[in-house]
Amino acid sequence: MMAMNTETLSLIKQSIKTIPNYPKEGILFRDVTSLLENAAAYKATIDLLVEHYRGQGFTKIVGTEARGFLFGAPLALELGVGFVPVRKPGKLPRATISQSYELEYGHDSLEIHTDAINPNDKVLVVDDLLATGGTIEATVKLIRQLGGEVKHAAFVISLPDLGGEARLTALGLELVKLCEFEGE
């Protein structure tokens, strides 16, 4: 985790509600919408990310559908750079490219506009939660296919026991996680 004000990080972590047995039995769901409902915690989340990434030369912020939009877009505004949404198939109106990724039972895919990332754009990927890393791996592949440089990813929540951190560092990404929930 990044070195930050522990009081602020505690506010953020405490604002995330844990819902047992959702969406199915045995799962502890980390509900980031409760953080969004707490204006102080939401602002603190964006402020910490801005403080960490300001001056690092990013030209685009990419957020993954759908909760990555809620953190990526305000971060992009504060950094003065464009925001690019990565969406599920059929949701973007212009020409797109697609990348499939594996789920626990089956597969899914993500799309990005072909003109959203320019060659040599320096890109930061943002999402609410890092679990297995499959969504972000697919997102990184899309960005790199368009010629963008992506070496950084930021998350509000990380679930390190699910293997996503190792998967993404193997792709050469430097990860920032505001809070972790281990062993759950």
Swiss-Prot record:
Q: Where is it located?
A: Cytoplasm
UniProt cross-references to SUPFAM superfamilies, sorted A to Z: PRTase-like
Return the PROSITE patterns for the record: PUR_PYR_PR_TRANSFER
One Pfam family assigned to this protein is Pribosyltran
For biological process, the GO terms are: adenine salvage; AMP salvage; purine ribonucleoside salvage
Q: Which GO terms describe its molecular function?
A: adenine binding; adenine phosphoribosyltransferase activity; AMP binding
Q: Matching Gene3D superfamilies, A to Z? A: 3.40.50.2020
Give the UniProt keywords, A-Z: Cytoplasm, Glycosyltransferase, Purine salvage, Transferase
| Recorded metabolic or biological pathway in which this protein acts | Purine metabolism; AMP biosynthesis via salvage pathway; AMP from adenine: step 1/1
Q: What is its main location?
A: cytoplasm
Q: Which reaction does it catalyse?
A: AMP + diphosphate = 5-phospho-alpha-D-ribose 1-diphosphate + adenine
Cellular component aspect of the GO annotation: cytoplasm
Q: Which InterPro entries match?
A: Ade_phspho_trans, PRibTrfase_dom, PRTase-like, UPRTase/APRTase
Q: What is its EC number?
A: 2.4.2.7
Relate the assembly described in the record.
Homodimer.
Name the PANTHER family for this protein: ADENINE PHOSPHORIBOSYLTRANSFERASE
Instruction: Tell me, in a sentence or two, what this protein's role is.
Output: Catalyzes a salvage reaction resulting in the formation of AMP, that is energically less costly than de novo synthesis.
Tell me the HAMAP family matching this sequence. Answer: Aden_phosphoribosyltr
Q: Which family does it belong to?
A: Belongs to the purine/pyrimidine phosphoribosyltransferase family.
User: What protein name is recorded for this chain?
Assistant: Adenine phosphoribosyltransferase
The organism is: Shewanella baltica (strain OS155 / ATCC BAA-1091)
Q: What is the lineage of its organism?
A: Bacteria, Pseudomonadati, Pseudomonadota, Gammaproteobacteria, Alteromonadales
